[in-house]
């Protein structure tokens, strides 16, 4: 008996020592594995699905790539580390591919210090990333507002973006900050190749270097930027502003003819539709500067360590808001230089980053170095479901010169559809749009990042 008792004590002691020596990463893997074991029970189907698509440290990553390239499916690894000096870090690594052989892979790290003191009440935030993406279809109709569908061509595009950005919220007189200094420096390594679509000509069959600057030769770019973001809430939280003023510089090597500068002014206004919306809708809004990478939602908390993201649930009250946005982008190229066509913004359908602009037109329909957009949208939940109805109106134009951006001759588009905000899952949207003289367009999109997390570095 004594030997058995001694063996039992030794076994328990060994188990305790192993548990104590278990790393946090292995502990997270163990918890996720235990959660996945419950997938066999029908009553646990919802929890199983959230573990598969939101679980940490590993989950299946799903999200749309650029328009016409499909939905990428792959794996994501999410980790985090807390330091004794109040610094916090999160790490994301993911890779995914689509049915047309397009793909994206990247690593992302967020680092921030807990807020405190008189200098800041919201933590400074640093975002390091390296992302590569290969798209087998990007459409090109030419430059400017007056191109025709007859010049529809396609090309393949690959780009690596490696860099870091920073956001430093500033507090005045000890109050919660309403503005932040933002800056970044990126290395951009683009590459253009012939289109492979059977029914659409390749870009080099209709366009040349003079009509598509940068077609014959692509160079690496050093791309710093600096700016100011303002995010005050006015009239007792009746209007939430999110303004960005940003200067970007794209430097090619030596005296590259593709170097240019860009100014962006983005003015976004959010108006909750009711007092209840202010309480519940805004509580679920993404932070201005999220602490999570594109695959994580750890900071939102959760009792289940294997699924720290918000759980899918029914809305407690009717929720909704109005969004009004004005966006201006102007590019400046020196004498003898030009903006590469693949870095010019587009309107029509969705752009390379999946942003809807002038949805009734084909994707990438109008392209130019200068852009002006007016957008209004209303989104409201349907009953208590995590589904919302969306209505939108766009007025937009592109220009080849700054003088082309005037308040006339806009293209317009009207849209209606549904959105799905289900816990931490990527937002899903379905939009039917019409307007203009080129028919209608249906747009379906799955956000490339989990709801409430950080976006990925823009492709242009």
Tell me the role of every PLM-derived stretch.
Residues 75, 93, 107-109, 162-166, ...:
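Membrane-embedded beta-strands of outer-membrane beta-barrel proteins
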Residues 96, 133-143, 148-163, 194-202, ...:
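Extracellular/periplasm-exposed beta-strand and loop segments of Gram-negative cell-envelope proteins
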């Amino acid at each position: 008996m004594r030997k058995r008792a001694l063996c039992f004590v030794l076994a328990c002691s060994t188990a305790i020592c192993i548990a104590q020596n278990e790393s946090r990463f292995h502990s997270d893997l163990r918890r996720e594995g235990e959660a996945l074991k419950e997938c066999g029970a029908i009553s646990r189907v919802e929890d199983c699905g959230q573990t598969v698509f939101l679980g940490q440290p590993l989950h299946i990553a799903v999200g749309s790539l650029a328009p016409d390239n499909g939905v990428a499916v792959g794996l994501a690894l999410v980790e985090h580390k807390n330091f004794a000096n109040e610094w916090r870090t999160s790490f994301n690594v993911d890779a995914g591919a689509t049915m047309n052989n397009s793909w994206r892979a990247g690593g992302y790290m967020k680092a921030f210090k807990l807020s405190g003191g008189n200098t800041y009440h919201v933590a400074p935030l640093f975002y390091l990333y390296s992302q590569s993406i290969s798209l087998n279809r990007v459409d090109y109709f030419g430059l400017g507002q007056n191109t025709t569908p007859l010049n529809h061509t396609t090309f393949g595009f690959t780009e690596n973006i490696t860099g870091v950005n920073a956001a430093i919220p500033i507090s005045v007189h000890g109050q919660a900050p309403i503005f932040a200094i933002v800056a970044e420096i990126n290395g951009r390594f683009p590459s253009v190749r012939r289109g492979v679509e059977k029914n659409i000509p390749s870009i080099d069959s209709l366009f040349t270097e003079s009509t598509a600057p940068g077609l014959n030769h692509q160079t690496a770019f050093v791309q710093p930027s600096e700016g100011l973001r303002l995010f005050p809430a006015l009239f007792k939280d009746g209007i939430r502003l999110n303004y960005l003023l940003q200067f970007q510089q794209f430097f090619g090597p030596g005296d590259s003819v593709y170097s240019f500068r860009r100014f962006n002014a983005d003015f976004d206004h959010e108006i909750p539709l009711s007092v209840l919306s202010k309480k519940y809708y805004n509580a679920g809004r993404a932070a201005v500067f999220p602490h999570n990478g594109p695959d994580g939602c750890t900071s939102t908390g959760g009792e289940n360590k294997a699924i720290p993201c918000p759980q899918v649930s029914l809305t407690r009250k009717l929720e909704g808001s109005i969004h009004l946005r004005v966006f201006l982008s102007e590019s400046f190229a020196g004498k003898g230089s030009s903006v590469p066509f693949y870095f010019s913004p587009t309107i029509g359908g969705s752009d390379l980053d999946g942003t809807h602009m002038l949805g009734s037109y084909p994707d990438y329909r109008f392209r130019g170095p200068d852009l002006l957009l007016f957008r209004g949208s209303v989104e409201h939940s349907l009953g208590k479901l995590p589904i919302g109805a969306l209505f939108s109106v766009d007025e937009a134009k592109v220009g080849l010169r700054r003088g082309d951006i005037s308040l006339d001759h806009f293209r317009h588009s009207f849209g209606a559809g549904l959105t799905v905000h289900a816990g931490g899952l990527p937002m899903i949207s379905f939009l039917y749009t019409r307007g203009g003289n080129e028919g209608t367009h249906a747009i379906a999109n799955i956000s490339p990042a989990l709801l409430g997390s950080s976006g990925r570095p823009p492709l242009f």
